[in-house]
Amino acid sequence: MRNTGIFLAIALSFGAAISPAQAWGPVGHRVTGAIADENLSGVARANVKILLGTEDLAEAATWPDDMKSDPADFWQKTASPWHYVTVREGDDYKGSDAPAEGDAMTALTRFTATLRDPKASPDDKRLALRFIVHIIGDLHQPLHAGGGDDRGGNDVKVNWFGRPTNLHSVWDSAMIEQRSLSYSELAGWLSRSITPAQTVEWNNRDPLVWLHESIALRKTIYPTDANLSWDYAYQHRAELDDRLKHAGIRIAAYLNWVFEPTDAKAAKTK
């Protein structure tokens, strides 16, 4: 990760001209970031502020997708597989099955190490933080935990209210955008529906748990009819909302843990 600061500097120079790519979709990712912002500890919030300045987690959550339009090899080749995981039906996740560049799980591990490394540069830590927020969101989208046979639903052609698209896009953005809400409106509505008990219950920092939840949900969302409209949206809206809420709570939980003072971590292990 030492050379990522160079790519970050290049990336920032292109940022204003880039149109968002889809992965959860920009609204979905911003929702998870906004929910996370509300659940950060004081220590985590201070560290995020040091790295991101006026940029909040809602904005940071979409940045790795924004950078997919950068033609540099880092974004087109190296970082491309970090948005998803492939686990074939009936298999367990094995990091050894990831591409040479890694996948979302291995990238999360590496970026976590960078964020906790006192010798890492601010640019490398900033890149790591943005990717951590984004990757945790992606791991909660069931089709970012694809089975390896249809590119995470991208090859499953469907019609969404008569418009040709694919199943991956339906889950990334179409079902969310159907509500015609801004990310802040949707995040506020979802946040108000999260009970204190759910915040405690969902406070899980294990990526394997998140991944297995997505795989279990993946099995239930493939339609028998390619013409999707109100029935499909109604059937799966609660599941989609839950994944967004889970992701937001867990982004915060993960960052609270990463930024927790070393002495506090040590005390918890005694």
What is the predicted role of each segment?
Residues M1-G5:
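Positively charged n-region of N-terminal signal peptides that target proteins for export
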Residues Q22-I135, P142-K270:
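N-terminal, motif-rich segments that launch catalysis or mediate targeting to/interaction with membranes
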Residues I6-A17:
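Bacterial N-terminal signal peptides
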